[in-house]
């Protein structure tokens, strides 16, 4: 009596493994998008720390951008750009000197996310940071505000 598996038994096991692997591969893109979103959120959170540092040193946000190498923003902007739904798109940064009568300088940074359509992550100089379904371009990028939308959820 010989011991071992027949060719048919091995083929059946390989077929079962292939079916299980295909189920995992179908679920994989969602996980990839969530991982990219986590990288974007992390980079923007670090960029908010840089925002506080720039204001503390300069008293304004004039040097808070993706192009000023001294403030450590270029690598953070590159991280967002590499994980943005439209690869290569930097986060949007907005600053204003006198946003309104009652406040001084302000800044905000935001980026579109991958996992949910029309969903952004935004952080601003007032301490607000979180997810929003409202396009931040009107509030954050508006020269009179530079603040995240009111519906931010953490």
Go through the PLM ranges and name each one.
Residues 103-154:
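Short, surface-exposed interaction loops/tails
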